[in-house]
Amino acid sequence: MSDRVIIFDTTLRDGEQALAASLTVKEKLQIAQALERLGVDVMEVGFPVSSPGDFQSVQTIARHIKQSRVCALARALPKDIDAAGEALRVAEAFRIHTFISTSSIHVESKLKKSFEDVLEMGVSAIKHARRYTDDVEFSCEDAGRTPIDNLCRMVEAAIKAGARTINIPDTVGYTVPTEFSGIIQTLFNRVPNIDQAIISVHCHDDLGLSVANSIGAVQMGARQIECTINGIGERAGNCSLEEVAMILKTRADLLGVHTNIRHSEIHRTSALVSQLCNMPVQPNKAIVGANAFSHSSGIHQDGVLKAKNTYEIITPESIGLTQNNLNMTSRSGRHVIKHRMESMGYAESSYDLDDLYGKFLTLADKKGQVFDYDLEALAFFSQIHEEPEHFKLEYLGVQSGSSVMATASVKLKVGQEIVSEAATGNGPVDAVYQCINRITGYEISIDKYELKGKGEGKNALGQVDIVAQYKGRKFHGMGLATDIIESSAQALIHVINSIWRADQVAEQMERNVAKTDKINTESV
């Protein structure tokens, strides 16, 4: 038996079914090319018979993808298989994936046929698909709830008909790992021609067990896992590609198998799919969540600084990230504060660690997470505990519409002076940001803009979180208001004030250096 597990990605077929809005052909191609870079062996990219648009997207992807095998789905019907075959003809290498339900509830209630009819339809579909390609995959839909005797008969007949891959789906995410592994083990024990095909699994996450079921199946001999980026898919989603890929890599000592996945492309691919599908990744998502490599506990942070593998079983670099995050919160210890100051180039002799740590705890209790620029200001700018607002929003007005360019008028209090500015922009938020940037004179680029709703009804608030770049450094801002334009402005002003404090620190440091140089010169 091979020690390689084939990764069959179905983000563009099963994953896309979960989206509120369909992806464009261009967006699907972007994702397909990202999957190719990631190293997936097979990508299922659509259901050609379902619509002209799906046919076109499958054909376009098939024409452009060269390294991965392109697959399309078809019911066990000649018209479905013909549509898939025609759409895939232009591919370098392709697969037709045909399926039929095999569980009693599906056969009797959905198909309203006998199992013998279903068996015959499955065999006929495989033979029809082989007119287009030798690479035919057959799925026993709802295999997890199919009587085992019927499942064994179907698998044996499908292999005899010419299917190279037999897929065993837990379509409704019903089974538990021992149960699903037992199904796979039984197939290997009872199907006489099982060695003539690759056994695949396709698990859904309705009970949160899709990844565990897939790994259990591999331990029993399955050599293909069907999965999606970020686990997107019908209902609660599908088996997560990034999770199974990293499990098989990290626990190769136990599982003894490998994949062709380029793990350093995982984070990049996850982010692209999240963006194009408009499906944010939950922060605590394994492998690709924002908190996956973040440490907030002081004990954990201290351990990671001493040896990363104390609390990290995989490295952020292994999935394409540059480093882990030590979130500075009220739970962080002195060791973390000293480490962050050293990483910014400040020797311990240039500040009082005990004094800095006391100020840090006060600020952390007030605002939650503290950033590097906050730490600098705490060390070298005495008024930081008062959170001085050098820039303060006094007035905001916007005019926009579908046929007019957005215009904004903004008044800021800058120190003790009121400064006004007007500007146009690509939408009201951009117009407001143009005004603020003109008033402050800072050349800022926005890396991330995120809007969240807080509360319900007419009293609901819009929270805007942004990450901005200024002179190579990242600054975080947050605004909260009933008007999202105002909350957007407040978020940028939050950033502006942080930048101003950072500049004050830099100027103070320059004065300190100049003063020291003068004293040294006079001493000489």
Curated annotation (Swiss-Prot):
EC number in record: 2.3.3.13
Keyword field contains Manganese: yes
Region (Regulatory domain): 392-524
CC annotations in GO: cytosol
Cofactors: Mn(2+)
Protein's GO biological process: L-leucine biosynthetic process
Biological or metabolic pathway of the protein: Amino-acid biosynthesis; L-leucine biosynthesis; L-leucine from 3-methyl-2-oxobutanoate: step 1/4
GO MF, any single term: manganese ion binding
PANTHER family assigned to the protein according to its UniProt record, in alphabetical order: 2-ISOPROPYLMALATE SYNTHASE 1, CHLOROPLASTIC-RELATED, HOMOCITRATE SYNTHASE-RELATED
Family per similarity comment: Belongs to the alpha-IPM synthase/homocitrate synthase family. LeuA type 1 subfamily.
Protein name as catalogued: 2-isopropylmalate synthase
Taxonomic lineage: Bacteria, Pseudomonadati, Pseudomonadota, Gammaproteobacteria, Aeromonadales
Gene: leuA
